């Protein structure tokens, strides 16, 4: 055992042991409690950053701790390998996306191995492998057969120069990120999965997720956006279809003074066909994608279409406007405008001098409608037969009236829209459909799956390479045998990440998407990832799990039992980025200090849910602590080995009850720390675990070894310390455990048990406050009376109470606190 801590040698030795023993390969065991720990799998960018180090260390610490508790632990790793960066690299560097991706995976795998994470590598999944996406295609066809998949036209961002669809993040100031061309809003045919069919269950089952952050659940509730309201039908003059609008305030219907539709609403296009000014307005809105969050602050613009609708109760004509604040993707793309009682409608009415009709009278307050809209409930006025009704009653009465006259109905509306899974990109899973002129859309037969993504394609940066690949596109219809074409869209990459966690359980299964192993391992017991995935990946994965459940593939309702959302890693108060020059390279960190130091620092510097501020001095402090643990263990190695030999031979036994006072006190501290650290591990509060380990080490390193019992105490305490640290710093603990003569490998050692008798003590430390301010401390016997405690408190705080009258003495036993109140 070297005197000096050499992290590179230590970590290589530990990793070789784990690799040789296949320490983390796991199989199903019905006799043990299972624990499935999973961190969101990474996109293979080629290099790990400190955010990766923190995220995956968190998962590894949890997995190792649960294993120490005796559970059957699965912790797999894989690669979310499809996506836009690979295509961009192909265009820029003239390298096939597959080759670029494989190189990046190899580089990142090497970095993961250096971190020492306890992964079952035999379950490694790469989503761009046909053996993986074959079953995604198979499942999509099952959903199509159930009527849960359909194709319809939808508006997308279109780059007219590159002839391709752009993701929202590829549109910069209204222009294509690569070509610089003005982006157009274009309607093309897209594939959708009916997530709205599961909206109610996705919403209600959030209540069962007790171990999810409340913030994430609320974000999903808001995204699903369930609301109870009324659908109202307006007949349109010289137009064949009724205009449907949705509102939660039908009590304001009598105050509607105009209607407004989205710029891409069919009625807007109809109006533009006969009105040049309307067409010019629509053209001016092309390429402007408005986020919902921007609606409150954006300039509201519109134009009168010249068309009119009929009010369903009064029969009066209402002008129909096209407005940029109405979004086609929300509701029906049309709204009834009540300027007196909706602030957005009021602002628009003020700008275009449209009438404002008050129909709700505030109760017991005055309101100036020249200044703003009144948006609360009240008493109806100017509403004909509905006058004098309270808003709450009027909502029901007016809805009933509309239903009786076929002019509307009560309905439940969701903000959530069906999931558009089409991408007009190359590097993704091919959608397994064939388009035949005679038969329409025909699924690829199961026996022809997977539809393999061809690699012999040309990347010009213009259009989708798949559309130019004749060998891929031109096929025979499996239904009629005539010439047909293959679907050239690929799946949104969120599809791959919506079910990968279940496939980890069944890696190697060639005859089915999932098998009974998925039912054993799912749901994931602990999932770890960023909160930025709250309403995309996490919602889609919940949806997919319910789809798989209904197909009989899994037997649980939710995919992830517990969710931990870690904070970001910051440096100088900012997120690490190359542009800011504040990036810390994990490779350099590991080369300099070792993986254990990196792991210890990221666990100690902050609670997992909070942002972590990088600190070079903090890293050095973590390294110094490990060096001290190593040096102490080396200093006492021979003694510890001798004690181990005694214990293994059955001769080592100490009656702790008969030990001297100072030993009992130190042992009490050690077991207090053990109890608290175990509690903190259970709550994922690893920063306080590390703090406890440092206190424990200080206690034993300062302890004077004088008797045989003292030696056994140090042996017991170092055994506890190493096991407490092992999930966080596994390499150094592995080597020290072996070199100090402990039985088995530390990864197979049971979690240390708290000796409850050690938690009992003959003495208690008290603090004394005088008028609420800390003034003294003292130690007293556990059986001291109240009178004795108060007398001791007065004695130790003598300088602060002399010449004062003590009005009251308050003892707070559970806090070991005595407060003296003086006059």
UniProtKB/Swiss-Prot annotation:
EC number(s) stated in the UniProt entry for this protein: 6.1.1.4
TM annotation in the entry: none
Primary localization class, coarse: cytoplasm
UniProt gene name: leuS
A Gene Ontology biological process term: leucyl-tRNA aminoacylation
GO MF annotation terms: aminoacyl-tRNA deacylase activity; ATP binding; leucine-tRNA ligase activity
Motif 'KMSKS' region: chain residues: 575-579
Species of the source: Legionella pneumophila subsp. pneumophila (strain Philadelphia 1 / ATCC 33152 / DSM 7513)
Thylakoid among keywords: no
Domain of life: Bacteria
Family to which this protein belongs: Belongs to the class-I aminoacyl-tRNA synthetase family.
Annotated positions binding ATP: 578
Record PANTHER family: LEUCINE--TRNA LIGASE, MITOCHONDRIAL, LEUCYL-TRNA SYNTHETASE
Entry keyword set: Aminoacyl-tRNA synthetase, ATP-binding, Cytoplasm, Ligase, Nucleotide-binding, Protein biosynthesis
Record Pfam families: Anticodon_1 (PF08264), tRNA-synt_1 (PF00133), tRNA-synt_1_2 (PF13603), tRNA-synt_1g (PF09334)
PROSITE patterns found in the cross-reference section: AA_TRNA_LIGASE_I
InterPro entries recorded: aa-tRNA-synth_I_CS, aa-tRNA-synth_Ia, Leu-tRNA-ligase, Leu_tRNA-synth_edit, M/V/L/I-tRNA-synth_anticd-bd, Methionyl/Leucyl_tRNA_Synth, Rossmann-like_a/b/a_fold, tRNAsynth_Ia_anticodon-bd
Compartment(s) of residence: Cytoplasm
Source taxonomy: Bacteria, Pseudomonadati, Pseudomonadota, Gammaproteobacteria, Legionellales
Short motif 'HIGH' region, span: 42-52
Reactions this protein catalyses: tRNA(Leu) + L-leucine + ATP = L-leucyl-tRNA(Leu) + AMP + diphosphate
Enzyme class: ligase
Protein name: Leucine--tRNA ligase
């Amino acid at each position: 055992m070297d005197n000096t801590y050499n992290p590179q040698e230590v970590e290589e030795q530990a990793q070789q042991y784990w690799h040789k023993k296949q320490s983390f390969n796991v199989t199903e065991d019905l006799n043990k409690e299972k624990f499935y720990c999973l961190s969101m799998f990474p996109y293979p960018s080629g290099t790990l950053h400190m955010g990766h180090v923190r995220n995956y260390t968190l998962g590894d610490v949890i997995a190792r701790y649960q294993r120490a508790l005796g559970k059957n632990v699965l912790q797999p790793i894989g690669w979310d390998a499809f996506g836009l960066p690979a295509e961009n690299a192909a265009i820029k560097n003239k390298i096939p996306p597959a080759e670029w991706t494989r190189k990046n995976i190899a580089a990142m795998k090497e970095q993961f191995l250096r971190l020492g994470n306890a992964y079952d590598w035999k379950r490694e999944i790469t989503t761009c492998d046909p053996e993986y996406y074959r079953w995604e295609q198979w499942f999509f066809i099952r959903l199509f057969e159930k009527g849960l998949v359909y194709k319809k036209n939808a508006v997308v961002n279109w780059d007219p120069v590159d002839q391709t669809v752009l993701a929202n993040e590829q549109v910069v100031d209204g222009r294509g990120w690569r070509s610089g061309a003005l982006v157009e809003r274009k309607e093309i045919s897209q594939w959708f999965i009916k997530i709205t069919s599961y909206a109610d269950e996705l919403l209600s089952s959030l209540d069962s997720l007790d171990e999810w952050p409340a913030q994430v659940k609320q974000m999903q509730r808001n995204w699903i956006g369930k609301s109870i309201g009324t659908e109202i039908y307006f007949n349109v003059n010289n137009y064949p279809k009724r205009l449907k609008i949705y509102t939660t305030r039908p009590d304001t219907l009598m105050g509607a003074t105009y209607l407004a539709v989205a710029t891409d609403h069919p009625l807007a296009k109809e109006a533009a066909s006969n009105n040049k000014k309307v067409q010019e307005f629509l053209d001016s809105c092309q390429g402007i994608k408005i986020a919902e969050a921007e609606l409150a602050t954006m300039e509201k613009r519109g134009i009168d279409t010249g068309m009119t609708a009929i009010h369903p109760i009064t029969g009066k004509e209402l002008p129909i406007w096209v407005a940029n604040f109405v979004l086609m993707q929300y509701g029906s793309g049309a709204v009834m405008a009540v300027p007196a009682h909706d602030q957005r409608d009021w602002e628009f009415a003020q700008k275009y001098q449209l009438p404002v009709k008050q129909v709700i009278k505030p109760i017991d307050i005055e309101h100036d409608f020249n200044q703003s809209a009144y948006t609360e409930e009240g008493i109806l006025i100017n509403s004909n037969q509905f006058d004098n009704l309270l808003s709450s009653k009027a909502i029901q009465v007016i809805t009933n009236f509309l239903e009786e006259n076929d002019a509307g109905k009560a309905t439940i509306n969701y903000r959530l829209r069906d999931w558009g899974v089409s991408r007009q990109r190359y590097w993704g899973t091919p959608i397994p459909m064939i388009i035949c002129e005679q038969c329409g859309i025909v699924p690829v037969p199961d026996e022809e799956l997977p539809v393999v993504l061809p690699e012999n394609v040309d990347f010009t940066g213009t259009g989708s390479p798949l559309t130019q690949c004749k060998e891929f596109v031109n096929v025979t219809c499996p239904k009629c045998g005539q010439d047909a074409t293959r679907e050239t869209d690929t799946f949104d990459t969120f599809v791959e990440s919506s079910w990968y966690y279940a496939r980890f359980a069944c890696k190697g299964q060639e005859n089915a998407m999932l098998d009974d192993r998925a039912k054993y391992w799912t749901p994931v017991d602990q999932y770890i990832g960023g909160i930025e995935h709250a309403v995309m990946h996490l919602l889609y994965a919940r949806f997919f799990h319910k789809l798989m459940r209904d197909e009989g593939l899994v037997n649980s309702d939710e995919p992830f039992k517990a969710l931990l959302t870690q904070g970001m890693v910051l440096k100088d108060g900012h997120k690490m980025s190359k542009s800011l020059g504040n990036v810390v390279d994990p490779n350099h960190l590991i080369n300099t200090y070792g993986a254990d130091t990196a792991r210890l620092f990221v666990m100690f510097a902050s609670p997992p849910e909070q942002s972590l501020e990088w600190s070079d001095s903090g890293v050095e402090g973590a390294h110094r602590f490990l060096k001290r643990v190593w040096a102490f263990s080396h200093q006492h190695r021979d003694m510890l080995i001798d004690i181990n030999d005694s214990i293994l031979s059955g001769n080592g036994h100490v009656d702790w009850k008969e030990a001297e006072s100072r030993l009992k006190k130190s042992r009490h501290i050690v077991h207090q720390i053990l109890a608290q650290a175990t509690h903190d591990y259970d709550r994922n509060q690893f920063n306080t675990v590390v703090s406890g380990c440092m206190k424990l080490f200080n206690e034993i390193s300062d302890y004077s070894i004088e008797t045989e019992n003292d030696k056994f105490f140090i042996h017991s305490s170092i055994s506890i310390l190493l096991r407490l640290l092992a999930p966080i710093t596994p390499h150094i603990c592995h080597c020290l455990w072996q070199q100090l003569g402990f039985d088995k490998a530390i990864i197979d050692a049971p979690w240390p048990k708290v000796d409850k008798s050690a938690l009992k003590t003959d003495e208690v430390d008290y603090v004394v406050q005088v008028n609420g301010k800390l003034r003294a401390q003292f130690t007293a016997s556990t059986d001291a009376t109240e009178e004795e405690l108060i007398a001791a408190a007065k004695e130790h705080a003598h300088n602060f109470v002399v010449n004062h009258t003590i009005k009251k003495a308050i003892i707070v036993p559970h806090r070991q606190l005595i407060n003296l109140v003086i006059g």
